[in-house]
């Protein structure tokens, strides 16, 4: 499994992403369920050492505004549909700082390294041939929207557990 460092959004933005997830599930796509939380993944590793949580928490964090923009498609055989997060100076700086804390951990994929990372919120995974058009028809008409990054959390995919690192305690 994977472990990650993620950004969590304000309640209004979460509700908008959840609405889009529900629309995609209604047409039979693999969108996250209500038990999942919309987030922006900053860093991923096969293991993030527990001792690094304190170092992550020492990194300066203040809530900041972002904009969720257009749709992107990652992959070809089983595409992933995502909503782009428009890069901003605070977002890029935070990703660079937090990545530096975990960069020695094992199993870090290249696509989360600074200057390669594409900020996004996942809408649907494992799309089969023919489903991409339906997915786009369902959510492409949604306009860009503003959000606030309220906090940083850690996710442990092995234990299916999350905990706050900084910012909001609302998990």
Predicted feature residues:
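Basic, often amphipathic N-terminal segments
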Residues: 1-67, 89-148, 164-171
